[in-house]
């Protein structure tokens, strides 16, 4: 029989503290822990070691071992790499008898033996009955002097060098525990190596002395010496790559939504380029009187600039008054709208297409921002825009129904593109329009039929102001509301946006439905009418 003393409890407490695991997870078999005289079994089977391991010895955690294995079988596994001081199998004491958890701690007498065992077993050897290779790494209690803190990556190494050459090169800086050249499947050097020193200070000295110190044979750049990437560094780099990919997708989606004008895009880019030239800066001072325009008028401002340029070009060749030409051109926009009052939905669709063709023709002309001054000083802007406003209204009940989807797609592209590029080219007016719409944030005022949107999958951090700013580029927003859970005071991730016209709502749907923000894609659709749920 084995003698029971207080020593097992003492050893168990030490193990619990050093292993950082629940006390119930640590147990030792008394017959392997104690002899009848109470002395501790070091399980090394050797007489040339003292009672304690070397000061720099490492306690290793070993996972993926069979649950049926005992300390004796584990000892046979580890002893080929060096004398074993102690093996502790982690057991589940909630079971009777306690069952192995499939992992253990092993302490060798020397640090070298532990590292050799790790190099030979970790992610390499798979034990009988296991599906994954052994996992062997320093225990948490050893992290203060972890290998990753002393391991160097050596780049731009001559492919003619072997491990001995690297050891000779770095041995002046301290004791080298491991030196390994990275090789490909063909066994040839990849031109880089890993060197592990006994202490971090030695590794730091090697970096200071060797980094960029020489260019080795066959290398295009000086030698690179730095700390090897840790697992944390690798995970962080992977997350950064994922974030970069998401940002690239977001940028692609953003520009994809902003380029809905198709062939008209170059003309609007020309508008932006001309707006940034010093000769055009004076043009903005003459249009401050337009600051009171609503978003619908602002939406068509770029078209007016194009019309003015077209009129000026026509005047130089035909001696016609530029402003009268502009007025007649804009009249082409208003006349089809008047005709669209007919009862025929097909006629309304054709009139809308005619208006769109005129709009595109005007926008396609060479843009001259300096003409806006003359246009602002001579012609009533509100009157000239009234025809285009009527176009919005004329599409309210007729143009949005009865098979005019193709027309609406084209109108959506034209309106959304003009709005966004005009906003970029005329920041003063756009900022004033933004101030006029601030009261829309948080309100629940509804617009006309077909002008109210329901937005799903909003980021939880989005508020009323965020959703307002997101949907303002497509028209005059009269209300924007994100719904909040009254219990948690957190967003429910959906909201409503209402415009003063259906065209703006369709433009927002075309541009923002499916738009990705972070890990979410917005779902934007028309809000159901209250009458939809009524049977009569």
UniProtKB/Swiss-Prot annotation:
Residues 58-141, 150-230, 451-529 form the RRM domain. Belongs to the CELF/BRUNOL family. The keyword RNA-binding applies. Gene3D superfamilies: 3.30.70.330. Keywords: Cytoplasm, mRNA processing, Nucleus, Repeat, Repressor, RNA-binding. Changing residue 105 to L: Does not reduce RNA-binding. Strongly reduces RNA-binding. One of its GO terms (molecular function) is mRNA 3'-UTR binding. One of its GO terms (cellular component) is ribonucleoprotein complex. It comes from Xenopus laevis. It is found in: Nucleus; Cytoplasm. GO terms for biological process: mRNA splice site recognition; regulation of alternative mRNA splicing, via spliceosome. It holds the Pfam family RRM_1. RNA-binding protein implicated in the regulation of several post-transcriptional events. May be involved in pre-mRNA alternative splicing, mRNA translation repression and stability. This is CUGBP Elav-like family member 2. InterPro entries: CELF1/2_RRM1 (IPR034196), CELF1/2_RRM2 (IPR034198), CELF1/2_RRM3 (IPR034199), Nucleotide-bd_a/b_plait_sf (IPR012677), RBD_domain_sf (IPR035979), RRM_dom (IPR000504).
């Amino acid at each position: 029989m084995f003698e029971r003393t207080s020593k097992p409890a003492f050893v168990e407490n030490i193990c619990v503290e050093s292993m950082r695991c629940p006390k119930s997870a640590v147990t030792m078999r008394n017959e392997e822990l104690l002899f009848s005289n109470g002395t501790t079994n070091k399980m090394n089977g050797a007489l040339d070691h003292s009672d304690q391991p070397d000061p720099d010895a490492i306690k290793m955690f070993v996972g993926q071992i069979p649950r049926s294995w005992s300390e004796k079988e584990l000892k046979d596994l580890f002893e080929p790499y060096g004398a074993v001081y102690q093996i502790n199998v982690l057991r589940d004491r909630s079971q009777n008898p306690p069952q192995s958890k499939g992992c253990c701690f092993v302490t060798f007498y020397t640090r070298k033996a532990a590292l050799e065992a790790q190099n030979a077993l970790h992610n390499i050897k798979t034990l009988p009955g296991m599906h994954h290779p052994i996992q062997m790494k320093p225990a948490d209690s050893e992290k203060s002097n972890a290998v990753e803190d002393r391991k160097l990556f050596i780049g731009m190494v001559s492919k003619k060098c072997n491990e001995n050459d690297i050891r000779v090169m770095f041995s002046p800086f301290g004791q080298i525990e491991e030196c390994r050249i990275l090789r490909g499947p063909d066994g040839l050097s990849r031109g880089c190596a890993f060197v592990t020193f006994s202490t971090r200070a030695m590794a730091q000295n090697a970096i200071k002395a060797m980094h960029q110190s020489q260019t080795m044979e066959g290398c295009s750049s000086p030698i690179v010496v730095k700390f090897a990437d840790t697992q944390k560094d690798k995970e962080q780099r992977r997350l950064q790559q994922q974030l970069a990919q998401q940002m690239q997708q977001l940028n692609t989606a953003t520009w994809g939504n902003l380029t809905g004008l198709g062939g008209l895009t170059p003309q609007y880019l020309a508008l932006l380029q001309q707006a940034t030239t010093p000769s055009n800066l004076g043009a903005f001072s003459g249009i401050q009187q337009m600051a009171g325009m609503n978003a619908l008028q602002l939406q068509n401002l770029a078209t007016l600039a194009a019309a003015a340029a077209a009129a000026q070009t026509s005047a130089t060749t035909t001696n016609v008054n530029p402003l009268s030409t502009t007025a007649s051109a804009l009249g082409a926009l208003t006349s089809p709208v008047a005709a669209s009052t007919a009862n025929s939905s097909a006629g309304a669709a054709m009139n809308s297409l005619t208006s769109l063709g005129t709009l595109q023709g005007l926008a396609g002309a060479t843009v001259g921002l300096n003409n806006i001054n003359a246009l602002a000083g001579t012609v009533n802007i509100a009157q000239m825009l009234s025809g285009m406003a009527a176009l919005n209204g004329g599409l309210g009940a007729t143009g949005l129904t009865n098979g005019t989807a193709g027309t609406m797609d084209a109108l959506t592209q034209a309106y959304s593109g003009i709005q966004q590029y005009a906003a970029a080219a005329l920041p003063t007016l756009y900022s004033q329009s933004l101030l006029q719409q601030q009261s829309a944030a948080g309100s629940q005022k509804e617009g006309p039929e077909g002008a109210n949107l329901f937005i799903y999958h909003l980021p939880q951090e989005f508020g009323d102001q965020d959703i307002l700013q997101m949907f303002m580029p497509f028209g005059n927003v009269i209300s924007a509301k994100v719904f909040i859970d009254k219990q948690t005071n957190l967003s429910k991730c959906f909201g409503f946006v209402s415009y003063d016209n259906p065209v703006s709502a369709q433009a927002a749907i075309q541009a923002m439905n499916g738009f990705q923000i972070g890990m979410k894609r917005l779902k934007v659709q028309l809000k159901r009418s209250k009458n939809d749920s009524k049977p009569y």
